[in-house]
């Protein structure tokens, strides 16, 4: 791996090493461009991943304290941890389930198709699905997405078989094991999915696509990547012309460092990216970097979800196989006759015992709750995932009264 000088202002600095940062780093390195990646978390590996939900959460998740306010359910229910994002090399590609779906045509024209929705800040995209299709195809090929490019789908586990039987009985037609960035056959030097059942905890077989062991090692092999784990960025600096000139961060030993740069790419997820841009305010950019619109941090969106679990007569063992093992897409289209904008998809969701209390009946106790836990092997579960509307009031801001350990 390369090691560039702190004063080398010819490098591109990328903040974050996940789906965006890790992939961009490899693309630039392959073209001979020197890159420094600053990642706040530590570097793990398939060998160091832990097949234990609670221990893995401590290993991969971003656990730095958050503060929340307002009446949004997210602020009330998850005040200290409003989003499950990862602080590790590879970012949330270590944790994600691997579902890799394309936007639908109408989702590029939500302002036109949905019309005015009270409280929603809607815009049409400046590009169309047809314009993006070549890039979708390129990404799907690179990631080995199943059911694209002639790549077969993954096998369905018992949880999928339960959902499939019910879906077909109800008349649904588009029911399958999904478009997943998980190898269904050996590919790109990695083996096929071993159906271990701990997709959220990091893939120990390496079958699930993650920049941790795909893009980043390929970038390192070029000699153009300087990856610095446990580097917590605190601000981006600029010169008197308003052009970025460097990044200030704390290294793994807690020492403040400054890396010069000709270009800075911020790829730190939906919370850390706006926080860093706002933290980098200066006399020239009083409202933060790239924020002349005042929109940085606004329009924070999440999943709209609902879940259901049921106990069956015979064992299901839903925890075996991929966490998201199947999907129903018949309801994904926009249908205004239903009385709401956008669509939704139904997916299997196999959760381990450590997470079941939050999904079954939060706060439950006693014999009834114990019965569900005793019958865990007989449970099958699914959830639906819908579209959250962008609202300017749902936003990421800086807390001026509370500081983190970096000040």
How would you describe each model-predicted region?
Residues 16-18, 22-27, 36-38:
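Conserved beta-strand->loop/alpha-helix structural units within folded catalytic cores of enzymes
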Residues 56-152, 313, 385-405:
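Redox-cofactor-proximal catalytic regions of oxidoreductases
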Residues 22, 242, 373:
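Aromatic-residue-lined binding/catalytic grooves and analogous aromatic/hydrophobic interfacial grooves
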Residues 7-8, 68-84, 255-257, 261, ...:
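Short, hydrophobic/aliphatic alpha-helical segments
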Residues 4-20:
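Beta1/beta-strand and adjacent pyrophosphate-binding region of the FAD-binding site
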Residues 74-76, 112-233:
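Conserved redox-cofactor binding core of oxidoreductases
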Residues 27-30, 34, 41-53, 222, ...:
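Glycine-rich loop(s) and the adjacent beta-strand/alpha-helix scaffold that form part
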Residues 77-84, 89-92, 125-126, 293-407:
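FAD cofactor-binding and catalytic pocket of flavoenzymes
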């Amino acid at each position: 791996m390369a090691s560039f000088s702190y004063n080398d202002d010819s490098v591109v600095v990328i903040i974050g090493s996940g789906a965006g940062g890790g992939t961009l780093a490899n693309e630039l390195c392959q073209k001979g461009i020197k890159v420094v990646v600053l990642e706040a978390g530590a570097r793990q590996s398939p060998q160091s991943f832990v097949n234990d939900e609670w221990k893995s959460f401590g290993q991969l998740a971003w656990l730095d304290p958050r503060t929340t306010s307002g009446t949004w359910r997210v602020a009330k229910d998850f005040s200290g941890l409003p989003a499950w994002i990862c602080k590790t090399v590879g970012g949330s590609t270590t944790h994600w389930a691997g579902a890799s779906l394309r936007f639908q045509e109408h989702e590029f024209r939500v302002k036109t198709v949905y019309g005015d929705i009270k409280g929603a800040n809607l815009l049409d995209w400046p590009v169309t699905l047809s314009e993006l299709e070549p890039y979708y195809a390129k990404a799907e090929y690179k990631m080995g997405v199943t059911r694209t490019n002639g790549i077969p789908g993954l096998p369905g586990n018992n949880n999928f078989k339960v959902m499939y039987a019910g879906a077909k009985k109800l008349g649904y037609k588009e029911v399958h094991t999904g478009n997943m960035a998980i190898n269904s056959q050996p590919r790109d030097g990695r083996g096929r999915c071993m159906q271990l059942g701990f997709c959220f905890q990091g893939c120990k077989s390496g079958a699930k696509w993650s920049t941790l062991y795909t893009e980043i090692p390929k970038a390192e092999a070029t000699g153009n990547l300087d990856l610095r784990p446990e580097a917590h960025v605190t601000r981006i600096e600029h010169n008197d012309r308003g052009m970025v000139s460097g990044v200030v961060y704390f290294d793994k030993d807690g020492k403040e460092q400054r890396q010069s740069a000709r270009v800075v790419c911020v790829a730190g997820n939906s919370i850390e990216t706006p926080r860093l841009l706002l933290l980098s305010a200066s006399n020239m950019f009083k409202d933060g970097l790239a924020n002349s619109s005042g929109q940085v941090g606004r329009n924070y969106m999440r999943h709209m979800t609902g879940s259901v679990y049921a106990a069956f007569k015979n064992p299901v063992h839903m925890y075996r196989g991929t966490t998201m093992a199947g999907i129903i897409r018949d309801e994904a289209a926009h249908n205004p006759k239903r009385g709401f904008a956008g669509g939704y998809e139904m997916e299997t969701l196999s959760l381990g015992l450590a997470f079941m209390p939050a999904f079954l009946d939060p706060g439950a106790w006693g014999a009834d709750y114990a019965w569900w836990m005793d019958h865990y092997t007989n449970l099958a579960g699914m959830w639906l995932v819908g579209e959250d509307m962008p609202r300017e009031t749902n936003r990421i801001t800086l807390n001026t009264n509370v500081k983190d350990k970096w000040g």
